[in-house]
Amino acid sequence: MHKKVLVVDSDYFFVEFLSQLLTKRGYEVLKAYNGKEGIARLEDDTVDILFSDLVLPKVDGPQFFKFIRNKYNGNPFPLVALSGIMIEQLGSLNEIGADYFIAKGPIDQLTIKLNEFITEIETRPFSPPEDKKVLATGSVFPRRDAMELLNALQFHQAVIECAAAGIIIVDSDTRIINANRTALEIIGKRSVEVLNCPVADLFVNAERADLVEGLKLVKRQVDIKKYSFYATLNSRVIGTLISSIGLKSEFVGWIVVLQPALRND
């Protein structure tokens, strides 16, 4: 039986390159183009190794790796971070959650490096290396523009994560792609339990109807900026506020804000 590999990257051509390399080595390759698709793939299949970029749409790389760790209670199979911004992450490899780290580079050199790497992990039992290091195709150095991009992304994620209100980011198919720690505390669930789950699953039947009405309303009528209602979540009355997310004049999802109701509300 062929071993299965999951490749997750938003770059279609890189996914095809890596898929062809792995197929030639006898692997069955599953593909995903964002972190949310990667989670969905793991719900339907089991894999023997995973390659993922760090900068991913919807659910980013570190969040994706964290999800896998929680879902499989530790070290289920080799998790390989393969990214063009790996060198810029040298100071925070422990925070990424992968077992191995490979920097993207020229395809001809990267092909050699990947074949050497795969041969190595095929010939010995999987045991996560104690020392975290980046495999690179040559002399590479951090780039200022990449560092600035990472800092901006991390800042915006920190704003969401540290907000006093619960914030849930919902994709256009109504599935959850992010929930900050306040939201997780309010609903009494872990991140692994809510990522890629329908947001309606958080609410009981009567309040689910309010949620669905709000989702539809703010999507269809752009002049309506928010829709609010009260819900009982984890035995507490929670003020729930829904607004739509627009990107380049296109609807891409919703923000659901959760705030425990005050006594005089």
PLM regions and their residue ranges:
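CheY-like receiver
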Residues: 112-113, 119-163
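Alpha4 helix (beta4-alpha4-beta5 surface) of REC/receiver domains from two-component response regulators
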Residues: 63, 70, 75, 84-103, ...
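Sensory modules in modular signal-transduction proteins
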Residues: 146-187, 192
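The feature encodes the CheY-like receiver
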Residues: 15, 56-57
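Acidic catalytic/metal-coordinating carboxylates
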Residues: 33-37, 60-66
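Terminal output helix/cap of sensory domains in signal transduction proteins
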Residues: 203-234
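Active-site beta3 strand of CheY-like receiver
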Residues: 45-51, 56
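Two-component/phosphorelay signaling modules centered on CheY-like receiver
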Residues: 11-33, 37
